[in-house]
């Protein structure tokens, strides 16, 4: 399956709290147990708690996406053979790109063979990367007092990570690269 632009997915800034309302979701794109997925050449704005949640996906390519969101950009969980290339992700209130190896599939599964290259990760105000104003006026996330917007490995992880490559990425106004044992 391929989703290719140009175009904009506008999630209207839904939060995890609002997702409890009938008919309301908190993910712009959610993929589970899929193979051979390509996402390329489009933009995503204010996409809720997850712009992209990929769980148990094999052979996933994310190419040249521009994501400007209020919470997580890309959550890659229990996935194999993933390429994230040439993406710009602004996520001041949460992680830009996070790799997990959780128990979401009902069994342990490593996240492996992941390459993140030529990406730009920032924590500017929501919506200001896509409109190129790069503002810094917004109050911080409601659940912590700092800008996040980083690449992270470790949240909710009880499985392992194998063959992870992060190369030629730029981190600006964010918390950089995090290797953490959190929630797992």
Which stretches of residues belong to each language-model region?
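Extracellular/periplasmic carbohydrate-active domains that bind, remodel
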Residues: 1-184
């Amino acid at each position: 399956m391929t989703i290719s632009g140009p175009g904009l997915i506008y999630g209207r800034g839904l939060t995890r709290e609002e997702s409890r309302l009938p008919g309301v979701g908190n993910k712009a794109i959610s993929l589970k147990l899929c193979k051979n997925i390509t996402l390329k050449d489009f933009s995503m704005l204010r996409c809720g708690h997850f712009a992209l949640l990929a769980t148990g996906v094999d052979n996933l390519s994310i190419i040249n996406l521009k994501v400007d969101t209020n919470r997580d950009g890309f959550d890659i969980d229990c996935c194999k053979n993933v390429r994230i290339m040439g993406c710009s992700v602004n996520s001041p209130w949460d992680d830009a790109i996070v790799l997990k190896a959780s128990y979401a599939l009902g069994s342990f599964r490593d996240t492996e063979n992941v390459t993140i290259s030529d990406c730009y990760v920032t924590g500017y105000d929501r919506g200001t990367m896509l409109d190129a104003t790069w503002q810094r006026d917004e109050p911080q996330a409601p659940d912590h007092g700092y800008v996040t917007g980083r690449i992270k490995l470790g949240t909710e992880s009880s499985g392992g990570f194998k063959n992870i490559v992060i190369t030629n990425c730029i981190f600006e106004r964010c918390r950089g690269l995090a290797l953490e044992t959190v929630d797992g």
